[in-house]
């Protein structure tokens, strides 16, 4: 029996989220809009629009388009998603990628597991030059990007494309994503899935390792 494939959403499980990056930018328009919002929102500072994303009432793309417009109105540059994302993610640098994700990909590949990235927005949010300099993208076997394919998670066709290109059936994948709508879409197809908790990444990675039969991560240092 072939090892199960590891399938990672990119933004969140692999790449730090904008909500985390703005913690280092107090006093900026981006900090005012995104700090303690999204998956890091609290009862004292809720983010009802993010809750709409999780419930499937609006798309994540619509969420970021609205935030980019607000960012512009608050003193940011152009009112488009790419400009706001570039403000946070340029230049491309190693610390944008979670160390736990690096370790998971490294260990999965060493154990013979195929590894894929299944994303909605990689090329919608980032330039080709930026993508080429984020080395983990080149460490996986397959990248399926909804912004290129014309289908966005949770549309079944995107998962189908991933299955075809990895050469594995749905039951032989383990999928990690931070959007509950995408998890539901995967589970409806029979894909074993783990919701990525931005507030508790270690627990999410540990659950994926368990499903893949990988040992717990050994901290470096």
Each model region followed by its residue ranges:
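Asp-based, Mg2+/Mn2+-dependent phosphohydrolase catalytic module
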Residues: 1-10, 118, 122-123, 127-221
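Short, charged low-complexity intrinsically disordered segments located at boundaries
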Residues: 54, 96-103, 116-120, 137, ...
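N-terminal helical cap/lid subdomain that shapes the substrate entry/recognition surface
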Residues: 2-103, 110
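Anion (oxyanion) recognition and catalysis
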Residues: 109-110, 187
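Short alpha-helical linear motifs
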Residues: 88, 108, 198-201
């Amino acid at each position: 029996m072939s090892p199960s494939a590891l399938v990672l959403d990119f933004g969140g499980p692999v790449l730090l989220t904008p909500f985390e990056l703005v913690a280092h930018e107090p006093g900026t328009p981006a900090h005012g809009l995104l700090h303690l919002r999204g998956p890091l929102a609290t009862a004292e500072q809720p983010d009802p629009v993010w809750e709409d994303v999780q419930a499937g009432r609006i798309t994540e793309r619509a969420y970021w388009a609205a935030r980019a417009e607000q960012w512009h109105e608050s003193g940011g540059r152009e009112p488009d998603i790419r400009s706001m994302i570039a403000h946070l993610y340029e230049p491309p640098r190693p610390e944008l990628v979670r160390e736990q994700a690096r370790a998971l990909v490294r260990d999965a590949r060493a154990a013979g597991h195929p590894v894929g990235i299944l994303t909605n927005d990689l090329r919608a949010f980032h330039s080709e030059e930026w993508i080429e300099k984020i080395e983990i993208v080149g460490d996986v076997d397959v990248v399926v990007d909804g912004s290129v394919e014309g289908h966005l998670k949770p549309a079944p066709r995107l998962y189908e494309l991933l299955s075809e290109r990895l050469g594995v059936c749905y039951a032989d994948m383990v999928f990690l994503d931070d959007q509950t709508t995408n998890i539901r879409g995967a589970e409806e197809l029979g894909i074993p899935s783990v919701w990525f908790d931005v507030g508790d990444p270690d627990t999410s990675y540990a659950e994926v390792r368990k499903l893949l039969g990988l040992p717990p991560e050994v901290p470096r240092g």
